[in-house]
């Protein structure tokens, strides 16, 4: 057998894998959508995910054997994309599955056969791993397959024991690795060495069930779940350095490189990373849109928007300034359409979505650049040299402005960015996002899944009752089932029935108390997991036990505020559709006790007049006292009546309809007032953009409006006292002060410019003549960067054909440099941006810009004379 595997295309590999298992009784199934049926998962992240209900015993399989090529997306380590050999957001997982049919022996035999005979991998290049306690698999590999003991590695549970959660189906797994360097021998094989080994096939043997105590018992029906990464096996068979250089991705990279006017193989590592990011992310966004995901600021729509923006940002980093994403998307579609015809069928939708998002984000980037200019001017005005991490993070988070670009522009202006502070802000955002998107604890979920067959679904009676006598069905502490818990313990409680509303549809869960004989539990939150309402709280007094009869009572005042705010969101959507645009649709919401938040899709913000009209319309509806009509209807009938549904939301066959006749009708499971008059009053407190194409309104209702107005009154009074004017005179006074400040700033800038010009005009006498060119290289004392640039432009205009290089030390340890070249100098091969960037390095800095005009900065003022001497020498050499 040859020492290297046979070369196959990615499409050939996919086909051969599926055909191999089809010939062995497996049903070939099409890839499931990237939008999973499992509500606990945002995107399809694994080949086995569509079969999870079967593995958990929740669904009877139609086939005993199946094989798929499943498209998957993972973004948990998105910053590693392009930086490692094999990390991607989009990947295909080839898999073969057995549902209570064949098991370990057959799975291993076929895994070896397809690897060595179908794909032609040399046996001497393969190493296998097994779970350290799985002697059965070890013996099969050694005695039946013939792998030498030196090439069978026993691994711990972290690497080779698969679990679906803290409880439930689980089992050992065995992995097949390819060895890129078998010449290093079999001694001291380290499978963690990714320069030598790559794991490409994982065989999971689901043979146990783990209970809450960690005990393992054999499953009656054992299952097989395998996964072979298509990109990984393609890298091996095509013998390329990484997944990105396979024929699955590299044509996309080449397209991006061509647009940028660069060559991938001769590019530096930073440029290669950007090209890889583009190649990977474009595959992701094409398939996401094909699976009917739309860019938004929530959920999977946010993931899509983030990926698109990263493509645009990395395009900028490699020199692409305009729109380009659809050119690379077309290449991705062409590569995928044979396996996934839906990408070509939905080509128009895909390209329209990408074009819209790219255009909007380019505008956002432009706004970010302008904001950065303002930040730079402010920092300089304050005599500082560092842009705060908070400012850089605002640019990154709000405008999608990459830190690298902020740093580059800052350096051109003799500034630095506080990267440590930026990382602190980034971590805060991660923690905020984690808290904002936190769902029920997976440990709780696993425990409830295990108990589901023994207890009934929670009966929710909260639409009509605020109190209920109930029985404690399940008691959990840290997600582990317990029989009892004492005072001071944080618990999760499932009752047989409850008046507590569980967080859903944007409305937060109720608060309140669960009490009994000597027992008081303060309930802080309620979440729904499957058919169970989980009450999160703390035992304030007594000992709570499973089976206890208790009284569950919600905080009535909090509920009233929440339901008033929820109805107000319905009225808000109706008013927006009526007054602003009938095509407006909800993109998200938050209904809490003290305020409401409503996100909606709109290409523009609301005018002040529109906000006032919306507010007035809602308050009119409140004053008109419209009564609610609540019905449960078949979904088709509800839609036929005109009920508004949330785009992308999944509904059952029957839906709850909240109807305020003549005003609003929506599908909704939340709690609402029985009459709009109960809301009292409504006030919009803010309207702003939260993402491209998504606006957010925050508002308050009822007594919260009075609280809001009291705070506003206090602010107005404080300002009136400070400026010594009446409240109604404040706008005029502030406008006057702003005008005075602008006038003063303009006068200051004018004086600086006049000073620089006065200093620079004297330099005309010192110009050197080199043939048809004149050059001026000089240092001006104490001139700021902007004035230095103006001086250079003026001097170049005076001398005509030539080059001007000026330097200055506007403040201690700060160097400012500028180069201005005429077109004739450019024709000699000199580019101002590259030239001044190289000169600035002498001063410990850098910079760049256009071929005819560029600025740079440095940190070592003592080296400025040397830098200018070098500039003069290079200009004379090039132009003399």
From Swiss-Prot:
Entry's EC annotation: 6.1.1.7
Cofactor: how and how many bound: Binds 1 zinc ion per subunit.
GO cellular component, one term: cytosol
A Gene Ontology molecular function term of the record: alanine-tRNA ligase activity
Keywords: Aminoacyl-tRNA synthetase, ATP-binding, Cytoplasm, Ligase, Metal-binding, Nucleotide-binding, Protein biosynthesis, RNA-binding, tRNA-binding, Zinc
BP terms from Gene Ontology: alanyl-tRNA aminoacylation
SMART domains for the chain: tRNA_SAD
Enzyme class at the top of the EC tree: ligase
Catalytic activity of the protein: tRNA(Ala) + L-alanine + ATP = L-alanyl-tRNA(Ala) + AMP + diphosphate
InterPro entries: aa-tRNA-synth_II/BPL/LPL, Ala-tRNA-lgiase_IIc, Ala-tRNA-ligase_IIc_anticod-bd, Ala-tRNA-synth_IIc_core, Ala-tRNA-synth_IIc_N, Ala-tRNA_ligase, Ala_tRNA_ligase_euk/bac, DHHA1_dom
Lineage top rank: taxon: Bacteria
SUPFAM superfamilies xref list: Class II aaRS and biotin synthetases, Putative anticodon-binding domain of alanyl-tRNA synthetase (AlaRS), ThrRS/AlaRS common domain, Translation proteins
Cofactor: Zn(2+)
Entry comment, domain topic: Consists of three domains; the N-terminal catalytic domain, the editing domain and the C-terminal C-Ala domain. The editing domain removes incorrectly charged amino acids, while the C-Ala domain, along with tRNA(Ala), serves as a bridge to cooperatively bring together the editing and aminoacylation centers thus stimulating deacylation of misacylated tRNAs.
HAMAP family: Ala_tRNA_synth_B
Similarity comment text for this entry: Belongs to the class-II aminoacyl-tRNA synthetase family.
Name by which UniProt lists this protein: Alanine--tRNA ligase
